[in-house]
């Protein structure tokens, strides 16, 4: 009983403590839970998103999709300063200085301090007299000719070499001897244009026309036997200005036209300049100098040497170069054991006074006297075929044989 009273007392205290009627709360609590459970809707599963069809990647080279957005300008990267940048800048400066100095061509003083402008004001005097056989005609003086004051002074010019090789001069001459040629060999010099230029391309057509007219007057005055044009270019210009004929397929040698109002023949030969590409060497041009000499002798009535036969001359630059390589023979080195192996067959002949002694120092004679073979006399026990001199009959068997024969005849 006491326990029940105690429990009821505690319940009454609890009800008195809460302002809200406790019994009403306890009675409505389960109903509220049910209402809450009924108001909560059941969770509906979310629909699955529709899957897009997977597109197969195209075969071949992959390309980036084009973007319609404008590209932003890329700012230039600023060079990163480092310790090496200072060194590279210095090296570039040094390299520029070196290359600048090497680019400047070294000027060669060809005229011993004389300027080119001063040489252009100079002219080269003609070397002409009456009764000349040949007059050599050039285009115009060059710088070296104007500086030297002589004709064809260039070290590479082939004129003076060809003059000697063809027989037109008896000795080898040079540009310093040009003034002696009229008296000794009947050869004179002149030019089509008097003005000095570095090259013939610096001349105008008006100068060529005027020069051709003056040249005809000179040739009509002195009337040499042959007017020799040193190069095709000179005669082509001369023929066009004087004869009014433009020559096609011009060939070297004697030409059909003569100088107007004279008996002077026109002869064309290759340019004596070393820059002549068709005939780069002096020996390639000598043929036309030889033909010039024959023409001069024919006009002067000099009989031709019948011992010399004329052959047809043809020249091919490529074949000439190939033949030059084939003809080049290297010298054999001296072999000290060569003569010993042949028993001194090619050594000095003891009969120095004899014009020809084919005996091999008495080797064959001694072998024949002893009845031995020639092969047993080979030194050092080396076997070698018999020398070709052994098969030639000896004209003098020994140095004293001729003296003995003379004594016996006496």
Curated annotation (Swiss-Prot):
Annotated Gene3D superfamilies: Uracil-DNA glycosylase-like domain (3.40.470.10)
Enzyme's top EC category: hydrolase
Gene Ontology MF terms in the entry: ATP binding; chloride ion binding; damaged DNA binding; DNA binding; DNA N-glycosylase activity; DNA-binding transcription factor binding; double-stranded DNA binding; G/T mismatch-specific thymine-DNA glycosylase activity
Post-translational modification: Sumoylation on Lys-330 by either SUMO1 or SUMO2 induces dissociation of the product DNA.
Keywords carried by this UniProt record: Activator, Chromatin regulator, DNA damage, DNA repair, Hydrolase, Isopeptide bond, Nucleus, Transcription, Transcription regulation, Ubl conjugation
NCBIfam families in the record: mug (TIGR00584)
Function: DNA glycosylase that plays a key role in active DNA demethylation: specifically recognizes and binds 5-formylcytosine (5fC) and 5-carboxylcytosine (5caC) in the context of CpG sites and mediates their excision through base-excision repair (BER) to install an unmethylated cytosine. Cannot remove 5-hydroxymethylcytosine (5hmC). According to an alternative model, involved in DNA demethylation by mediating DNA glycolase activity toward 5-hydroxymethyluracil (5hmU) produced by deamination of 5hmC.
Similarity comment text for this entry: Belongs to the uracil-DNA glycosylase (UDG) superfamily. TDG/mug family.
Name the record gives this protein: G/T mismatch-specific thymine DNA glycosylase
Organism expressing this protein natively: Homo sapiens
Gene that specifies this protein: TDG
